[in-house]
């Protein structure tokens, strides 16, 4: 169960960069339903981080990706109106590149869009997602 968990849930995220663009998905499910974010999701029991990332990206974007280095590890803790922990994820974000396919909306996303780096503010990303994306561009450029 993801809502009101007994322990943190491990998740993965993909920063997929193409030139000066990054791939974003509009989330189809909570938390952050209908918000723009990086493709990714929860790791299943018995699944490696990298395998989970490849699966989640394919489910959300129909792309096959090659998983690169870790960009950042962060936690996302959401509390309800009574200050109870409603969500707690530990997320490992990776820099990825497209191996094959065309980005289209998969089963776990409302929309998929290549966003210009200079235009990220219009997607109203979380502070953490914006930081991870900028760090990924810096890693790619170094």
Where are these regions (language model features)?
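A conserved beta-turn-beta hairpin within the catalytic core of GNAT-like acetyltransferases
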Residues: 31-34
